[in-house]
């Protein structure tokens, strides 16, 4: 029975999703398609990697999971509830893909690629909405026993009110809401915008160190719920020594570096505001401006063509299309650093010229 279930839930084809952010096959040297902090890696992470004791490499990582949970509880101030460590949010997403009946899962659209790969065909929409809302999440919870949504939202950058998410989960006690907070550290107040620490038993939180701390080569994160039985049900039995001791050593050092985190966060917020202004001035783009995270999202009928122009300048941007629930197609672009702006603007000039020459450019407007 178990083998039949797994066979029916094999990893789907990559067709339709395009190259994910950071994929080296893009052939670019300024990769704004991946949402990793461009000011990373955190210096403390690099220092930790250089100074790791030989014994920590020699021996099995017996206490790696415990150390990661300890630093997460320290950083967030959440001491209650059940928390387990894993290899980023990805481990938990794919574990659910193996453990759950896919027919029970709703993924509000548009959505992060891995949700739609782990749960093929489970995209949820009420009326073709393109920007997530709490009302959409509420409707999804009413339609199925489990809903997974990212907050801040990938790919749109929308930030839903955590208290409202808790309230809608509480209103559907027979369903479970999984909130992936992989981008929460990019917000102005990560603890305040998180659902972590709520007292309802049917809300699960995922977090990851990979993106914000600029250490995506390491795989470290956690899952939390007020009810430990939920974690067992969703993720099953974790493997022995599943976490790399080296990854955890690096991740813990990065999380403890509050000063760098605050400085980096401020710089990215400034960069993102600059990018929003630039995109708002390009006819043919319809930006959904946000002040929540380090990337911007814009609808564009010719998103693939625009991405190719950027690629010709050695710049990677992410195209979202029908496979993600985006209609029309859209672009997700991480804000370039201040020292990268001149080169980025050169590509923008070519994009604007190409859209104008095509006759398809419309006056720039905000979503």
Go through each PLM region and give its residues.
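Conserved PLP-binding catalytic core of the aspartate aminotransferase-like
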Residues: 269, 281-313, 331, 335
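Conserved beta-loop-alpha segment that forms the PLP phosphate-binding cup at the N-terminus of a helix
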Residues: 65-69, 79-103, 221
């Amino acid at each position: 029975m178990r083998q039949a279930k797994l066979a029916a839930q094999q990893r789907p084809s990559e067709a339709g999703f395009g190259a994910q952010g950071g994929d080296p096959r893009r052939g670019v040297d300024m990769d704004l398609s991946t949402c990793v902090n461009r000011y990373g890696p955190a210096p403390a992470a690099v220092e930790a990697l250089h100074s790791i004791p030989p014994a920590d490499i020699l021996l099995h990582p017996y206490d790696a999971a415990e150390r990661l949970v300890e630093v997460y509880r320290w950083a967030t101030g959440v001491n209650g509830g059940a928390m387990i460590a894993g290899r980023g949010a990805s481990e938990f997403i794919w574990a659910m893909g193996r453990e759950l009946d896919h027919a029970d899962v709703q993924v509000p659209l548009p959505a992060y690629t891995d949700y739609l790969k782990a749960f093929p065909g489970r995209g949820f929409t009420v009326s073709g909405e393109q920007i997530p809302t709490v009302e959409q999440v509420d409707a999804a919870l009413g339609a199925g026993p489990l809903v997974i949504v990212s907050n801040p939202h990938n790919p749109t950058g929308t930030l839903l009110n955590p208290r409202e998410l808790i309230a809608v989960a509480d209103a559907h006690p027979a369903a479970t809401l999984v909130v992936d907070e992989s981008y929460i550290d990019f917000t102005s107040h990560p603890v305040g915008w998180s659902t972590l620490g709520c007292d309802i038993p049917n809300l699960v939180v995922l977090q990851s160190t990979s993106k914000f701390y600029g250490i995506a080569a390491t795989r470290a994160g956690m899952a939390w719920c007020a009810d430990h039985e939920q974690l067992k049900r969703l993720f099953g039995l974790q493997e022995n020594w599943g976490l790399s001791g080296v990854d955890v050593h690096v991740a813990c050092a990065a999380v403890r570096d509050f000063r760098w985190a605050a400085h980096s966060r401020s710089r990215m917020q400034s960069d993102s505001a600059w990018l929003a202004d630039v995109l708002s001035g390009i006819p043919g783009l319809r930006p959904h401006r946000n002040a929540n995270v380090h990337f911007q999202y814009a609808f564009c009928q010719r998103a693939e063509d625009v991405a190719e122009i950027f690629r010709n300048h050695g710049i990677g941007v992410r195209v979202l299309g029908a496979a993600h629930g985006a209609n029309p197609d859209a672009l997700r672009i991480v804000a370039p650093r201040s020292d990268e702006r001149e080169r980025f603007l050169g590509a923008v000039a070519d994009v604007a010229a190409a859209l104008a020459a095509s006759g398809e450019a419309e006056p720039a407007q905000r979503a």
